[in-house]
Amino acid sequence: MDSASQDINLNSPNKGVLSDFMTDVPVDPGVVHRTPAVEGLTEVEEEELRAELAKVEEEIVTLRQVLAAKERHCGELKRRLGLSTLGELKQNLSRSWHDVQGSTAYVKTSEKLGEWNEKVTQSDLYKKTQETLSQAGQKTSAALSTMGSAISRKLGDMSSYSIRHSISMPVMRNSATFKSFEDRVGTIKSKVVGGRENGSDTLPSSPGSGDQTLPDHAPF
């Protein structure tokens, strides 16, 4: 058996013999990271594009650092001015809403909604519904007006009755019947009062009683 094809068993006493015949092969670092050239580009164009890409990435890193510094400076200025986070949030929301209103999607949606609204308002169904609601509103207004007139008329009748009743009371008091009744009541009252003043507890005798007297003692 040739020595190059030695047993590679780990338990073999001849292990590692092949390592004596292996030598280090130098590798170009540029070959490791280099990818195959893009189709349609020469090596010179590829190198130029890679150089430009590295430059742009470096500029992006620089701009991020500048932006972070500017944001810190802006936050410090707001803190010194006493601007709250809520006010900043409102400004951001307002700015975002303004951006949304100016966006193409929002404009197209608004135009589409306007077209739909115009179509709906011009449709026969919408017009019939609007006419029906208008007629119902007119009937309701007329019914309320009639009810209000009836209530006002009823209140007017009650007021007129109260006024007539108030006016009729003095007229009734000045009538002959009312005066005759008052005279009779006054006569009876004066007789009762006069009898009590004379020490007599008996009521005045009625006409036609004569000289009849009551017995001294009751027959008990």
Curated annotation (Swiss-Prot):
Pfam families: TPD52 (PF04201). Residues 1-14, 200-212 have a biased composition (Polar residues). The keyword Nucleotidyltransferase does not apply. Residues 40-82 form a coiled coil. The modification N-acetylmethionine is found at M1. GO terms for cellular component: cytoplasm; perinuclear region of cytoplasm. The modification Phosphoserine is found at S3, S12, S19, S96, S149, S168, S175, S180, S206, S209. The keyword Acetylation applies. The modification Phosphothreonine is found at T177, T187. GO terms for molecular function: protein homodimerization activity. Residues 1-26, 189-220 are annotated as: Disordered. Keywords: Acetylation, Coiled coil, Phosphoprotein. Forms a homodimer or heterodimer with other members of the family. Interacts with MAL2. Belongs to the TPD52 family. This is Tumor protein D54. It comes from Rattus norvegicus. The lineage of its organism: Eukaryota, Metazoa, Chordata, Craniata, Vertebrata. The gene is Tpd52l2.
